[in-house]
Regions:
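N-terminal hydrophobic/helix-forming segments and targeting peptides
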Residues: 2-375
Length: 375
């Protein structure tokens, strides 16, 4: 299984002709393809930890699996680079007499696009394949009451014909993920199931790697964090931000690309693939941190797009910024088409610029520097 996955990663790297190293593309593909449903992130965290360990001064994980890699330990200020490791998923909730599995959602999964998909149930004895059942259109075309599916109506078929057979394979509480994997599309565009938010954990790891190459120039302590359970309530970020007590934090997540038909840009903003990362202004984003990021991007010719936040961002930034006495924080986002679907599309060129920007921010920090709103 491991060698097959590694071979696929090498094939993808050989087909990619862009700004990232082959080793980085291979890491991204392994990270995306490793299932990490909310509350069950350990397999993906191991992939992340294996990658960052060679260039970190220290690594550790906490009781729930938030995983941290530290560079320049003891430096000041203390900078946290955070991204969540989990993906939207489902969980086995009930097994009926015929052996079909009924599910509950973990995170913002859409029942309408989940029907007729291949899935994997993650059990203590290994993965079990299944499909989300779907009634053929021939059998429903004369049904005047046909409606969009609800989560409680979805069922998973694992190829058995009784509850007893099903219970030999799966248990209530086993997590379920969709089985679509990483692939290159055209140019620098890639498609996958879980770019939300493996691109973030990839970016913070890459930023740490880049910083490790010029560690002597670094005055800040940098803590790269792959945190858990964002999709079900921003839970891991609360835990690890409280533990680490950073002086400043940069959060990486995806945002909605709005450059395709049917999306109202007047309502949702104008965000495109291939036009650079997005920086959020307002809300919990500290104005001085945002201004520093803008200036650094301009000096390094990194194109930025901008989004407005009047209150919450819906990301880990929302809980990090009010931890303890308030941590100066900013959100950097990667535009993502078709978010929370099996076919999320991102630009790898956009993605490559995020660790560059975070590394530049870390290098810009002077010993003991603080970010405060000027009164």
């Amino acid at each position: 299984m491991f060698f097959a996955a590694l071979l696929n990663c090498l094939r993808a790297a050989s087909r990619y002709n862009g700004p990232m190293r082959d080793e980085s593309i291979q890491f991204l593909e392994r990270l995306v393809n490793t299932p990490s449903p909310s509350g069950h992130e350990a397999p993906g965290q191991r992939v992340w930890l294996d990658y960052v360990t060679p260039f970190a001064d220290d690594t550790f994980s906490d009781a729930y699996g938030n995983t941290v890699a530290v560079l320049n330990k003891g430096g000041s200020p203390r900078l946290m680079l955070a991204a969540h490791a989990d993906e939207i998923s489902m969980v086995v909730n009930f097994i009926n007499k015929q052996g079909f599995l009924y599910v509950r959602k973990m995170g913002g999964i859409d029942p309408a696009i989940t029907k007729a998909q291949r899935v994997v149930i993650h059990t203590k004895n290994g993965p079990v394949k299944g499909v989300v059942g779907n009634v053929a259109p021939h059998l429903t075309k004369n049904d005047p009451d046909r409606k969009l599916p609800k989560m409680e109506d979805l069922f998973v078929d694992i190829g058995v014909d009784s509850r007893k057979q099903a219970e030999r394979l799966v248990r209530v509480g086993d997590p379920i993920t969709l089985s679509d994997q990483f692939d290159l599309l055209r140019g620098d565009l890639a498609v996958a199931r879980a770019f939300d938010n493996r691109v973030g954990t990839f970016a913070v790891a890459e930023a740490l790697r880049q910083l490790s190459e010029e560690k002597k120039k670094l005055q800040a302590e940098v803590m790269a964090v792959s945190n858990i359970m964002e999709e079900v309530g921003l839970l891991g970020a609360r835990q690890i931000a409280y533990t680490l007590k950073p002086d400043v934090a940069l959060v990486v997540d995806v945002t909605h690309a709005t450059d395709y038909p049917t999306v109202n840009q007047q309502q949702h903003g104008d965000i495109k693939l291939g036009k650079g990362p997005s920086l959020t202004r307002g809300g919990c984003n500290h104005p001085e941190v945002v201004a520093r990021l803008e200036a650094l991007a301009e000096s390094r010719k990194i194109k930025l797009q901008f989004e407005a936040s009047s209150n919450n961002t819906g990301t880990d930034t929302d809980v990090i910024f009010w931890t303890r006495g308030g941590i100066p924080s900013a959100l950097i986002s990667l535009p993502n088409r078709y978010m929370h679907s099996p076919v999320e599309i991102v630009s790898l060129k956009d993605l490559a610029q995020i660790p560059q920007l975070m590394a530049a921010f870390a290098r810009s920090l002077k010993k003991g520097e603080e970010f405060k709103v000027k009164i």
